[in-house]
């Protein structure tokens, strides 16, 4: 197996195993959501970030952690509506 095929198979394995590693058909919204969730989880994992944010927001560290966790549910808002082209074609034929 050539080096290129090996790299492609390793990439496919990572994409199947871990959420957020992306794929060829990923949408912009999905990619941004993964980026925001990665950042927010990093903030939660580092206590110095939580301390900094708690001082800046004048909140307790626990409250900042809770607020950050709730932001992770939908960090970029709802997904945009996808326009279905098949309905447009059917409407034009009628």
Swiss-Prot record:
GO terms for cellular component: nucleus; precatalytic spliceosome; U2 snRNP; U2-type precatalytic spliceosome. InterPro entries: SF3b5/RDS3-10, Splicing_factor_3B_subunit_5. Involved in pre-mRNA splicing as a component of the splicing factor SF3B complex, a constituent of the spliceosome. SF3B complex is required for 'A' complex assembly formed by the stable binding of U2 snRNP to the branchpoint sequence (BPS) in pre-mRNA. Sequence independent binding of SF3A/SF3B complex upstream of the branch site is essential, it may anchor U2 snRNP to the pre-mRNA. The keyword Nucleus applies. Belongs to the SF3B5 family. It holds the Pfam family SF3b10. It comes from the Eukaryota. Keywords: mRNA processing, mRNA splicing, Nucleus, Spliceosome. The keyword Transmembrane does not apply. It is found in: Nucleus. Residues 81-94 have a biased composition (Basic and acidic residues). It comes from Dictyostelium discoideum. Residues 75-94 are annotated as: Disordered. Component of the spliceosome B complex. Component of splicing factor SF3B complex which is composed of at least eight subunits. SF3B associates with the splicing factor SF3A and a 12S RNA unit to form the U2 small nuclear ribonucleoproteins complex (U2 snRNP). This is Splicing factor 3B subunit 5.
């Amino acid at each position: 197996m050539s080096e290129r095929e090996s790299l492609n198979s390793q990439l496919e394995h990572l994409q199947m195993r871990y959420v957020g590693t992306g794929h060829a058909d990923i949408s912009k919204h999905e990619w941004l959501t993964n980026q925001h969730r990665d950042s927010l989880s990093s903030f939660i994992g580092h206590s110095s970030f939580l301390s900094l944010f708690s001082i800046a927001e004048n909140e307790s560290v626990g409250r900042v952690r809770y607020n950050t966790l709730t932001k992770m549910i939908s960090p970029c808002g709802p997904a945009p509506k996808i326009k279905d082209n098949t309905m447009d074609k059917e409407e034009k034929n009628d």
